[in-house]
Amino acid sequence: MRHVSEQQLKDIVAKYVLGEKIATTSLTITRDNALGLVDTIGKIFMIDGDFVDDMPELDGEFLSYGKTIEEYFIDLIPPMDKPDLDSEKYAEALKYYAPANMPTSYSTTLKPKVLATSVPFNDINRAVHNEDQLVNAVTKITKKLSDSETSMIWNIKFQLLGEACKKCIDAMSTTTTFAVATAYALGTYLKDSDSNARGIIVKDYKANNATSWADAVTKGYIQVLDLVTTIAKPVDTETGEAFIIQLKKDVKKAKRISSGYSLNGNNIGATSTMKLYILEDLTAYLDVKVEAGAFHQDKVLAPVGVKEVRDFGDADAKIFAILVDTRGVKLHRTYIATYDNTNGLLGFINYFRHCEYTAFLSRNTFMKVYKEA
């Protein structure tokens, strides 16, 4: 009886399974058969995956007519005292009380994109064994139109979140210092020279309407903004717990009436459509290192969805998360069509997937960016 040791078997297999015979990009034709015919390919196939956009919550409705999005916002009304019957303030009954409108904003088309592929005639059939393989190969070619668009949409959403981050950071980085003797238009971002705080003009400010930054805030001309928190990336227990504490504070604010957490600084009503987008490599640290369990809804104290993202497009690499009201971040498809044409002379058919989108960011919904120093 012959015996083979484990090591002997490993050595035999190592000499048998040769790398040059596996996953190579070239093939040497062989005729190892009695008739001297070319040895046939035994299996022809393609391993394909599912290209899925895992952020459907950022899909806006299809815009069939018109591609520009116009957003307006009417802010809260200040209460006033009711005059007495004998106060002679009769004119106030017929006075025009203009709505407290915030600046209107626009999101325009990102312009059309085209995805193109070709299927040659009298070509693939030369290589396959049967009709099923031919149909499968052609289907795979045309399927890539849809797969490629899905991948593009997915990446556009990363970039759209990144653009939201950029706008928040830009607002909190303004270098325009508030001067009491200068008039400012609605929507102007300003900086306080003393506290280094940032704010936005939410009521038309005329020269000397206030005596200081604090006075302008008190009188309702300036809304202080809190759009960015600079905090250590959560990679261990200490930094993870610090981030979760800050997140809980911000989620609480989002679930109540708040102001200063949008690009317009307007008053925001409570919302249940909040979601935290965080870099995918950080959730493992938070789940393992932090006992509080950052992403358990009962631990966050208020329901908030969590979505892992690969990145935030080309935004600052120090950004690792953003908390947003998903109603204010949408990608709208405005056109989709697939056309084809045939080249009869050369013998192939072209397929073209036409698509167009409008990316929308609200200036009036909750946003909070988290970044490293």
Segments predicted by a language model, with ranges:
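Extended, compositionally biased alpha-helical segments that mediate assembly or anchoring
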Residues: M1-V38, Y285-A373
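Extended oligomerization regions of viral-like shell subunits
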Residues: A185, S193-D194, A214-T338
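Long, contiguous amphipathic alpha-helices that act as assembly "spine/axial" helices in icosahedral shell
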Residues: M102-S173, I349-Y351
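Tryptophan-rich substrate-binding surfaces of secreted polymer-degrading and adhesive proteins
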Residues: T174-D226
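Flexible metal-binding regulatory segments at protein termini and peripheral loops
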Residues: R126-N130, A207, R363
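Intrinsically disordered or highly flexible coil/loop and linker segments, enriched in small
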Residues: D50-F51, D147-W154, F158, G260, ...
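Assembly/oligomerization interface modules of large self-assembling protein complexes
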Residues: L35-T117
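Alpha-helix boundary/N-cap detector
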Residues: V4, T25-D32, G36, D132, ...
